[in-house]
Amino acid sequence: MKLVIDDACYAYREIFDHFGEITAISGSDINANSVKDADVLIIRSRTKVNQELLSGSQVKFIGSTVVGLDHIDQNYLKTKGTQFFSAQSCNSMAVAEFVISTIVNLVDELNFDYQKKTLGIIGVGNVGTKLAEKAKLMGIKTLLNDPPRQIRENLDNFVDLNTALSADIVTFHTPLTVNGEHPSYQLLNENNFHHITNKTILFNAARGGVIKETIWKKHKTLANIIDCWEDEPNINPSLQNTAYLATPHIAGHSVDAKFMGSFMVYEALCTFLGKKQDKNIRNLINLSELSIDKSNLKDTLNEIYDFQQDANAIKDVNNFEDYRRNYPIRYEWHHFKSKTVLPIA
């Protein structure tokens, strides 16, 4: 069996080697010639999966080790009869930790009490749910907006989009969709940006394109935190230069998230092939407990991981892709023992 794998997939040799012959290629370099003889294709977000890539191939299984789906033509895969799996939820804890860590750092920067602020969470799926749980532990009031989920589950504790946009802190965690009853493409745009004021802290840790950047750069906010960009890796210099934190789409890049992305695809491939799983694969991320000797939450979180280093790394925007590919080691909070109680939910 021949496997073509994006070489940025975590521990791909250790996890997938026993399935067959591996060809590892940079995701942006995977093309029709690369996959024409492959049986399995395992990717991240930089490979466009469509008819152009696959029309001359024999690929039977495609696994994506990331959450985003806007680079996948799922309708074409269905017509071709190609099995597809995406590692949904693999990075949800990492993104929630990114948002909470940034809010805690902003407390000192802007001198506010987060327990007196409202947090508007737009998109309450895997990430939004975990973020809401952490916010509750910290005493932050949340305003939850997710029309598809609200309708599907008949939830009465959700709010409309304009109410969520009026929160003190607004953060987006939707997928990027352009069709359907509730498309998220340019969800925040010239028609509703007036709800965002010069007292709003605004996050995009969802997908580039959820916020219309040509409008965003014209509006004054209290602080912008931007991890996802419309035209990655060509990020908007005006927004980058005025942001409190501008990072290269790494909110979900914890070691745990990258491992789970690969592991979830491994599980799906085992199921597809009818193979028994190797229980030792899970041991690739087993760690001894790590200790931190800090006396407050901000210092503890920054000792675990200081996201400002990510912003500093892409002051030269040409470093965007290289930095993502060679991202520093970052473990999630549950690995750490600390004097300070961490909002682990």
Curated annotation (Swiss-Prot):
Keyword annotations from UniProtKB, A to Z: Cytoplasm, NAD, Oxidoreductase, Pyridoxine biosynthesis
Binding site for substrate: S45
Positions that bind NAD(+): D146, T174, D227, G252
GO function terms (MF aspect): 4-phosphoerythronate dehydrogenase activity; NAD binding
Any Gene Ontology biological process: pyridoxine biosynthetic process
Subcellular location: Cytoplasm
Pathway as given in its UniProt record: Cofactor biosynthesis; pyridoxine 5'-phosphate biosynthesis; pyridoxine 5'-phosphate from D-erythrose 4-phosphate: step 2/5
Swiss-Prot/TrEMBL catalytic activity: 4-phospho-D-erythronate + NAD(+) = (R)-3-hydroxy-2-oxo-4-phosphooxybutanoate + NADH + H(+)
Residues at the active site: R207, E232, H249 (proton donor)
Location (main, coarse): cytoplasm
Cellular component GO terms, alphabetical: cytoplasm
Enzyme Commission number: 1.1.1.290
Gene3D superfamilies membership: 3.30.1370.170, NAD(P)-binding Rossmann-like Domain
Subunit: Homodimer.
Job of this protein: Catalyzes the oxidation of erythronate-4-phosphate to 3-hydroxy-2-oxo-4-phosphonooxybutanoate.
Family statement: Belongs to the D-isomer specific 2-hydroxyacid dehydrogenase family. PdxB subfamily.
UniProt name for this protein: Erythronate-4-phosphate dehydrogenase
The species this protein was found in: Ruthia magnifica subsp. Calyptogena magnifica
Originating gene: pdxB
